[in-house]
Amino acid sequence: MNAKGQKKPMLSKSRRLFLWTVRGGMWLAAALTGALALFIVGYVLIRGVPNITWELLNTSPSYLEDRIGILPDILNTIYIILATLAVVIPLGVGGAVYLTEYATNRRLVGAIEYAAEALSGIPSIIYSLVGMLMFSNNMGTSLMAGALTLVIMNLPTILRNTQESLKTVPQSYREGAFGLGAGKWRVIRTVVLPGCVDGVVTGCILSVGRILGESAALLFTAGFAHAVNGFFDGLGSAGATLTVALYVYAKEQGEFGVAFAIAAILMVLAFLINLSASLVTRKFHRKAEG
């Protein structure tokens, strides 16, 4: 009998029932997940957006004048993001380049990669304790102590992400550049890094999202102050970021309207950060294909 004459095997009734059950379960799980996400986003926005005013965004809190403002918290968040990225990007990218392009001891490289994976899974409150002992006890509670703590937290992520991006560059590109007489560093600078810049940039943007949403690592290191300072003065003094301020207003002061307003702002910022990462990746992919 030829292939055309063969009939497709009929599924048994129990088999069809099983497949329908699995398919229905997957659809139900997807629907519940989507509904829960929409409920959380909608609830936070409904509770938070009406409380977002220009006065809230542009003033400092004052107990004497019975005024609430989050301008210092916004500035502190910007300061700590900039300070963290200024340290963690050179360390993470440079370390990844060394491990991928220069290191010859594979056991050492494997040990470092394993340590980076392990550090990525440590709860952030432990980093807060480490940061307090290493930085706050020596330089005092300050945004700089919090930024250095966040550097330790985000370094493994940027290191491993950059490593994986470097490995996507074909070895033939390196060999071709070497064949043209280029040196090691010139090959890395002109061939390897441009070939994986999309992954590196995306990893850095996503790290901004993690820094933005971090609170536990800053509780014992950055402090709770709400004072407007310049960049360098701000790094040397204690200050609350938006996430820490959210905790303070909700837990300590019972200002749930302000807490939901901050939550809505953070949610929008997180969405914009993830959207930026997606757009950057898509742009580099189009450039590479075109």
Q: How should these model regions be labeled?
A:
Residues P61-I68, L218-V268:
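Interhelical loop and adjacent transmembrane-helix boundary motif
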Residues T21, L99, Q163, K167, ...:
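C-terminal transmembrane helix and the adjacent membrane-cytosol boundary/short C-terminal tail
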Residues G5-G25, G42-T84, N105, V248-G257:
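Periplasmic/extracellular loop-to-transmembrane helix junction in inner-membrane transport proteins
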